[in-house]
Amino acid sequence: MLWIALIIAVVVLAYYFLRRKPQKADISLLPEHFVVVDIETTGLDPDKHEIIEIGAVKVNRDSNVHTTLSALVKPNKKVSKKITELTGITDEMLDRDGEGIESAMNGFLEFIGDHRLVYHNAPFDHTFLTKAASLVGRKIENPVSCALDMSRRAWPGLKSYKLASLAGMGGLDTNGNHRALKDCELTMTVYAAAATKLGRIS
């Protein structure tokens, strides 16, 4: 069902942006295996703020069976009201269900293996995760793709390249965005649509 929804969304995205006969998603352009990753944080500065949620979807291009990882992460400081309003993540949720950053990162690094990582905004997410990996004495050396960068090259001149805006143009349900796993689903669709438009991944 996930690939069916993806293909439908890519067709809609293609029509919206190109105003001509829609392109069918060419999933052969995608890596055979890749991991879509999204995080939620307490702010924008990786030197001051912390990860509070990690979501990842390990995609098998030639199968409809994908595996997911979802982890709430306990920060050292309380979550601001603004972040709770944006993500729906509360201090109570983190106290009850969150794990330490070391445990969360070890689980994440095991999950991703050496697969390509796909983010919507790679400089943001990857910087936070690289810094967190250093806390457990690890490095992230996986190849990286940025759906945001690909979208800017695929569809220049848009008013907004926010994930919800791009996904909404494709007719996707964006309710629940700003939670990590939901954003992974949206990112995967935008990534596939941009790859189809560009004729390649990057």
Regions found by a protein language model. Name each.
Residues 139-151:
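Conserved beta-strand -> loop -> alpha-helix junction used to position metal-binding or nucleic-acid-contacting
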Residues 174-196:
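A charged, well-structured terminal subsegment
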Residues 103, 152, 186-187:
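Short Asp/Glu-rich motifs
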Residues 1-3:
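Transmembrane helix interruption/hinge and helix-loop junction motifs
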Residues 6-12, 19-26, 169, 188-202:
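Acidic two-metal-ion nuclease catalytic site recognized across multiple nuclease folds
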Residues 13-17, 21-142, 156-160, 164-178:
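Conserved non-catalytic scaffold segment of RNase H-like nuclease domains
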Residues 41-43, 149, 186:
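Short, glycine/acidic-enriched loop or turn micro-motifs at the edges of active sites
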